[in-house]
């Protein structure tokens, strides 16, 4: 029985490790489409801006959903209360 070996890292994991170390390994050089997806260092601020926009957008959506839920509950309670008063 062989001892269980750890599975080899996936393609994206290797790519992320290479990008973090600032080097692109030989197996990526042939695949230029993947390299173009990685932003060059000078365009990092644009990426940060996009991430901030995404965070604000999701924050607004979640806040809107929370307010809508609260209003819906208040409306249901109000209708229930009015129906109880009529009897």
Curated annotation (Swiss-Prot):
Its main location: membrane. GO terms for cellular component: membrane. Changing residue 11 to A: Complete loss of interaction with host ITCH. A motif (PPXY motif) lies at residues 8-11. It is found in: Membrane. Late-budding domains (L domains) are short sequence motifs essential for viral particle budding. They recruit proteins of the host ESCRT machinery (Endosomal Sorting Complex Required for Transport) or ESCRT-associated proteins. Contains one L domain: a PPXY motif which is involved in the interaction with Itch, a member of the Nedd4 family. This is U24 protein. It comes from Human herpesvirus 6A (strain Uganda-1102). The gene is U24.
